[in-house]
């Protein structure tokens, strides 16, 4: 009985946290100056895309390791090569997710994200849609960047009961990722730590 009560409590608590945390984003998201103009641009672009391109826009591969013909074995993918650049150009992916293997140093990461975007926007098919460059930089034990500010994880932030601490942590992570050319962070998450 106690186990079911605890599960219900945790589910209710997580639902409440997610609802309350979404309220804080209302003030951050500004309305577009002209929503009709944005819709028109998107509709125009979509009308020119093939079905294959539309499907590819929903795909987000990772390139953690790569082995070119001249390599003796797989290596962490940290520097753009001709093979990956051609894949990005040919397939019109919607994004690429980066992991620790990709983001060792600040300068290296910025160069890689710049090269990925250049490959995505230099195609000859006319779509030239920039990539969503993503990562799951949550803080705590889920820390992908090889350099940057080490911040506490969600459990530690929650223990402080400080919305200011959580906000500051999110802002630091957001600024650092943006400076590296990463435009989506799959965080924070509503993980339940089942093995503390």
Region locations from a protein language model:
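Enzymes and membrane/adaptor proteins characterized by extended Gly/Ser/Thr/Asp/Glu-rich
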Residues: 64-78, 86-196
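Bacterial N-terminal signal peptides that target proteins for export
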Residues: 2-13
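Mature N-terminal segment immediately following signal peptide/propeptide cleavage
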Residues: 38-68, 89
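Sec-dependent signal peptide cleavage junction
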Residues: 20-37
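Structural motif corresponding to alpha-helix initiation and N-cap regions
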Residues: 39, 78-82
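Hydrophobic alpha-helical targeting segments used for export or membrane insertion
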Residues: 11-22
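A generic local structural motif
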Residues: 4-5, 17, 82-84
């Amino acid at each position: 009985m106690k186990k079911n009560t605890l599960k219900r409590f945790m589910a209710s608590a997580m639902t409440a946290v997610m609802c309350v945390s979404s309220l804080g984003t209302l003030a951050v998201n500004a309305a577009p100056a002209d929503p009709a103009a944005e819709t028109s641009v998107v509709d125009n672009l979509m009308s020119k895309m093939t079905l294959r391109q539309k499907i590819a826009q929903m795909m987000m591969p990772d390139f953690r390791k790569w082995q070119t013909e001249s390599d003796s074995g797989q290596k962490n993918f940290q520097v753009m090569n001709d093979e990956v650049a051609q894949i990005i150009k040919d397939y019109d992916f919607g994004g690429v997710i980066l992991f620790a293997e990709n983001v060792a140093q600040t300068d290296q990461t910025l160069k890689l994200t710049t090269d990925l975007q250049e490959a995505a926007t230099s195609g000859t098919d006319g779509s030239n849609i920039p990539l969503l460059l993503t990562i799951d930089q949550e803080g705590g034990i889920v820390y992908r960047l090889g350099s940057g500010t080490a911040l506490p994880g969600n459990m530690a932030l929650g223990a402080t009961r400080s919305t200011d601490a959580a906000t500051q942590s999110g802002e630091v992570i957001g600024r650092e990722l943006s400076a590296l050319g990463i435009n989506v962070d799959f965080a924070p998450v509503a993980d339940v730590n089942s093995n503390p």
